Structure formats: structure tokens, C-alpha cells
Amino acid sequence: MKNVNLISSSSQKKGRIYYQITKKYRKTKINLSFCKGFRYLFPKKNYFYFIKNYDKMKLTRIFVPIVASLVLYSCASNNLSYEGKAFKSAYESIKADELKKNLMVIASDEMEGRETGSEGQKKAGVYMIDYYKNLGVSYPKALGSYYQKVPKEALKSRRGELPDSENILAFIEGTEKPEEIIVISAHYDHVGTNNGVVYNGADDDGSGTVAVMEIAEAFQQAKKAGKGPKRSILFLHVTGEEHGLLGSKYYSENPVFDLKNTVANLNIDMIGRSDKENEGKNYVYVIGSDMLSTELKKINVAANKATQNLELNYKYDDPN
């Protein structure tokens, strides 16, 4: 499989994150992103509707293909079936009630809408780190902690100055190719408060945040069972997305791992509910898989077919 390198973040369109990647010496804009809907603001009245109807949305079914895809991505194509079976018990450990429990905290009023650099966002970060500690999932040794500080100088926003913030990183080392890194990411910031109203960000991107956390738990369970990932996995929670992908940009320019060893990034954003045109469907928008590599698209399709058979919607899968 050819190597694909993440080198910098560039632009935003309808909730998607774009990353500049280089494949040998050819540059193109790309991201493999899983999205479900594109509404940004999620005030309290919608937050309670979201929680009330959570079970109906079957969120756990969205995450399973992502998990399976990553495992299969670590394997030779002729061994996809075996590895899928080996990981089945781990990905089945992802439960809707666990996702809901974490989301109720991440998107609670106590977190004050998780504005970049705010005390509420920092509280959310502490909760996430405690979660990883309880799982036994550590941070990258080279970093020395779960925090990658993002200084205010790197958080220049058109909306005004922002204080220092942090990306949060957790890490599971691979068994056969530990030097090669797969990144699973989501942004954990939101838009804060406005006129005393908390914009909880349950969907944007509380849903992606708790997905990454639960995926980490599944991989850790697989590792304990002797079926850990062959490549290393970095669970990356970025800050400053709402102000222009600033945390993603900072990590791209200050990577913890050499970018030439980063073989893929799967980003998860707003997978908590459907949009109007897809109401009632079990679907997910997939963005960038074929542009990134034909192998990644084939693996994603095969993993989905073998697990939950979601509708893979490529409506927003374009290079511009």
C-alpha cells in the first residue's frame, strides 16, 4: 500500500475538514471524513430533543464501519475476513448507552459550549483524559502528556483574540508496524454561549468526540485480547475548529509523529443526526476516500458491507 502523508490543513466547506496531503511529489486536497448532517449551532432546546431521540438515531451503527475499516486497513487485502471476525467482539462493545453517557457530559451546560480556550472546554478535556486513563490508554511518549498546547499566537481568529488552548492526544502502539500511524480525529470545541444561552454542541462535534473515545475503548479491548492494531493509532481531539481548523493546522505544522509515517486520517464530524433529505435512513457521508487512495475506499466499502451495511453517501465527495 502506498504511503499518504498529512502535511497541513487548508480550508473548510459545509462542515468538512480538508487536509493537504502529498503522495510522493504530487499534492492534492483531501480528507476522509464521516459526517451526518451539517447544522452547526445546537442550543439547549435542540440539545434536549437530541438526547430524547438519541436511541432512535442508532448512533452506534454509524461508528462500527469506521472501527472495522481501521482494523482492515492494517491488514493485507486477502486477510480482510479473518481480521474482521477477530475484532467483532471489540467493536460490538460500542454501545449506545455508553455513547449517550459520555455525550451527556461533553455537551452539558457545565462545559459552557466548549468555546476554544474557555474553562468549559478545559473541563471537557479533563473528562476525556480521565476516560483514557481509566481505559489504560496512554499518550504519545514523545509528547509527555495528553496535552499538545496550542498557544494563542496560533489561534488568531476573525472573531477576536483567543486564549491558549490544547489538542488532546491518546495513543495505542501497533504490534507489527508501530512506526506507522493512523489518526482518528474529531474536534471537541464548539461556539460557547451567546446572550446567556449555552450552545451545547451535542452534534457539532460532541458526537464525533464521543465516537473517537468509544473507538479507542474498542481498540484497547482488542489489544487486551491479543488482537491489537498492527499500525499505531493516534486518537486526536483538536481545538479551534470553529475558528478555522486552527487546532488541525497546528498539529499539521507541529506533528508529534513524523508526517511521512502518517498513513491515513479518519475524521469524524457531526454524526449525531440526519438531515431532512435523509430522514429515517441509516447513512453516513463519506468524503475523500477515493481521492486519498483507491485501496482505502475499497476497504471502507468492504468493512461496511461486512458489519452494518450503512448507506455510504458520496454527495459531498468532491475535491473543491
Where are these regions (language model features)?
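C-terminal motif of bacterial Sec signal peptides marking the signal peptidase cleavage site
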Residues: 73-74
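Alpha-helical metal-binding/catalytic segments enriched in His/Glu/Asp
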Residues: 168, 184-243
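Metal-dependent peptidase/peptidase-like ectodomains
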Residues: 238-320
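N-terminal capping segment at the start of a domain
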Residues: 82-88, 92-123, 135, 139-141, ...
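Second-shell loop/turn segments in exported
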Residues: 84-93, 109-119, 155-158, 196-205, ...
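Cationic, amphipathic, low-complexity segments that mediate targeting or membrane/lipid association
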Residues: 1-51
